[in-house]
């Protein structure tokens, strides 16, 4: 059984596919960067420079191997999201991880977007199978 789940679409952030991992709504690094209007490398650099402030399973999930393969297959079958074929791992950000990034970016845009994500994307209701 895959740990990836599809959720019902967010009414305010329809451009982001509603993704879930281990029952937790998540965003990819690309999605988070797009929302905050920064480059992906800025998200990665903030994470690298503040790694001790992030806890895996609480702020993010780092998936690889079979988990990554299952997640990619599930997402790519339902959405136009594409992942690199040779991507060895993928970081998925939880609501708490997205909040940490908003704090580090410390821009009005980041805080406004986080509030929107908090009220919509991270509050989606699971679809019944």
Task: Report residues per predicted region.
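An anion-engaging/catalytic patch
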Residues: 1-129
């Amino acid at each position: 059984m895959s740990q990836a789940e599809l959720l019902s679409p967010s009414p305010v952030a329809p451009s982001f596919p509603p993704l879930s991992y281990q029952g937790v709504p998540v965003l990819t690094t690309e999605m988070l960067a797009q929302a905050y209007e920064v480059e992906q490398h800025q998200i990665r650099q903030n994470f690298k420079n503040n790694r001790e402030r992030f806890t895996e399973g609480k702020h993010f999930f780092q998936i690889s191997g079979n988990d990554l393969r299952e997640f990619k297959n599930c997402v790519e079958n339902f959405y136009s999201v594409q992942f690199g074929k040779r991507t060895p791992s993928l970081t998925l950000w939880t609501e708490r991880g997205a909040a940490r990034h908003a704090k580090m970016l410390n821009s009005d845009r980041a805080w406004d977007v986080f509030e929107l994500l908090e009220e919509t994307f991270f509050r989606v209701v699971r679809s019944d199978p």
